[in-house]
UniProtKB/Swiss-Prot annotation:
Purpose of the protein: This toxin activates voltage-gated sodium channels. It shifts the voltage-dependence of activation to more hyperpolarized potentials but has only little effect on channel inactivation. It is active on Nav1.3/SCN3A (EC(50)=3.98 nM), Nav1.4/SCN4A (EC(50)=4.99 nM), Nav1.6/SCN8A (EC(50)=1.27 nM) and Nav1.7/SCN9A (EC(50)=2.42 nM) voltage-gated sodium channels. In vivo, it induces nocifensive or pain-like behaviors in mice when injected intraplantarly.
Domain of life according to the entry: Eukaryota
Protein's UniProt name: Delta-conotoxin-like ErVIA
Keyword annotations: Cleavage on pair of basic residues, Disulfide bond, Ion channel impairing toxin, Knottin, Neurotoxin, Secreted, Toxin, Voltage-gated sodium channel impairing toxin
Tissue-wise expression: Expressed by the venom duct.
Organism (species): Conus eburneus
GO cellular component term of the entry, any: extracellular region
Length: 31
């Protein structure tokens, strides 16, 4: 799943995932 967020993006507790948009984890989350 690809999600585009406006300047929001931080690593989740899961490897290979990025936390963005309402604290949800998405693969390859673009800032």
């Amino acid at each position: 799943l690809n999600k585009r967020c406006a300047g929001i993006g931080s690593f989740c507790g899961l490897p290979g995932l990025v936390d963005c948009c309402s604290g949800r984890c998405f693969i390859v989350c673009l800032p």
